[in-house]
Amino acid sequence: MNDIQVMNHAADNIRILAASMVEKANSGHPGGAMGGADFINVLFSEYLVYDPEDPTWTGRDRFYLDPGHMSPMLYSALTLQGKFSIEDIKQFRQWGSPCPGHPELDVMHGIENSSGPLGQGHAIAAGAAVAEKFLEARLGKVMMQHRIFCYISDGAVEEEISQGVGRVAGTLGLDNLIMFYDANDIQLSTETKDVMDEDTAAKYRAWHWNVIEINGNDVAEIRKALDSAIAESERPTLIIGKTIMGRGAVKADGTSYEHSVKTHGAPLGDGAYINTIKHLGGDPENPFVIFDDVKKLYADRREELKKIVAARRAEEKKWAEANPDKKQLMDEWFSGKAPKVDWSKVQQKEGVATRAASSACLAELAKQVPNMICASADLSNSDKTDGFLKQTHALKKGDFTGAFFQAGVAELTMADMCIGMMLHGGVIAACGTFFVFSDYMKPAIRLAALMGVPVKFIWTHDAFRVGEDGPTHEPVEQEAQIRLMEKLQNHKGKDSVRVFRPADADETTVCWAMAMENTETPTALIFSRQGIAKLPEGNDYEQARKGAYIVAGSDENPDVILVASGSEVSTLEAGCAALRADGIKVRVVSAPSEGLFRRQPKEYQEAVLPYNVKKFGLTAGLPCTLEGLVGIGPNSRIYGMKSFGFSAPYKVLDEKLGYTGDNVYKQVKEFLSK
């Protein structure tokens, strides 16, 4: 056990570095970082197990930060670990720095998740805890004996997502999840008492958490709480640590600057900064220093960790020799490579809804991909993720041998937990709900896109053909929103999200194959509620791999090109016979993914959608959904929704809203006559 004075000195060292980073950048959040320094120091210098020489070791404990604005605390602690240099943290919030304002996924530097939007980080941590339990059930305790640590703030507790995480983690009994709640009673605009009057401990106890309340700035109490959390074998643990915002901060006039809203989101300021650094034992002229006793503290921990890791790796080697088949599976699962799937085993029925076609694909994935988890937000029998569920069973407290995650009605929680499963490694995650409820998931979709996490988002009931449920449940603008993400690149130059909306059952199989092959970005799969007619005989569905392609039966040298995705492709086909009877040569293009199409060679794009040929687009979403393919101007026309939907049987809505072959004929004839 390390000397308390050394531990307190190390925490003060973190405070000095954190405050100095913010001061130098003239931007950031020093107060919370200073309050949380004691906990992060105890965790990193005495409890967190990791390999100092291999940050990617699968057996490592994971630490997930939820309040990304507390990055100065995390960067400072990681600097003491040796993962960042002093020069690195001096460049906090600057162009090209490895220390951005909010942490971004960087496992080599010890950062397990991008964080910032409050609440999502601890949902990600809960997902990682599920992944560890899932893998333990398949590989055993030797390979999966690590813990998931998470750090949350008052803001995360206030966010609605905390309800979902609290409920799910408690229900599943995630005893490998240890969460520290930095309860400093201060937020950006007010003290928390002005906006939150609740018994948080009682709330989490009601969710069946092990709740421990401590002084979060007291080393002995932090240690005792962590020991208790590690010993817990039935429940997730919440350590509520009462901390002091801006601990150790001193104003320019020499009075205390602790417990002040002003230190939350702004530099301390010249006089206060100088007095604070002096008060904490640092030199304002040379603040970016690691104290000698703190260097020794972390050097000793590194040596201790080398011994711990060596012993663990010896256990792992012995396990691998005794379980060569499982070792091979584990290597495959953690490789990040796409799984091998025999798609020929998927037998599709003609004319079914694409959600049913997706169900057939999911059934095979459940059989062929043993490290895949599928989830649904209380809609498995409707979004047809039950195709997967029928081949396995749901995850339950004490039984993680199943592979289906019933998240309940909590779309954002589900999405972020699936991200966490994949960030943990070894697991492929997919999650489903109605397309209109993708709105609840947008923050998670954005984080997955930013981090390049290849979660599979399954969205069904894709248009006004939801029918009788009416406009609250009928997506109109959602497709345009998600397809915009295909136009946004991540920092690696990839389309941030890959979107597929297949035209029939067989095209669905190809889209699912591409989704499983996509290991670099999230994939959105958009499926219909209603049955869809099969595309013309002889259609080459493998051409869907190019994002957009010419449907079988199209005419050479067309007078007009008809473009759509999803069920609207068959509606276009329904209008073609009458157009051809009038002597009009027609090409039909199915475009399940505009983003993928725009990644094709220019020659292919021009061959499918030649610039000088008139184009007519049909979409059950906003007209702008197809503007990137059909264009705008006199040679282009798009027929789409101008309002929200209505409540009526979907076939009635098709007639009333003009989504029929007859109206396609009428619209195209009128378009060509001008």
Functional labels for PLM-detected ranges:
Residues 277-308:
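Non-catalytic, alpha-helical, charged scaffold/linker segments
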Residues 155-161:
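Short acidic, Gly/Ser-rich segments with clustered Asp/Glu that frequently serve as metal-coordination loops
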Residues 150-151, 179, 375, 616:
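Residue-level marker for buried hydrophobic side chains located in beta-strands
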Residues 1-146, 295-296, 302-526, 531-533, ...:
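Thiamine diphosphate
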Residues 149, 373, 561-563:
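Conserved beta-strand elements of the Class I
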Residues 153, 433-434, 564, 590:
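Glycine-rich anion-binding loop/nest that anchors nucleotide
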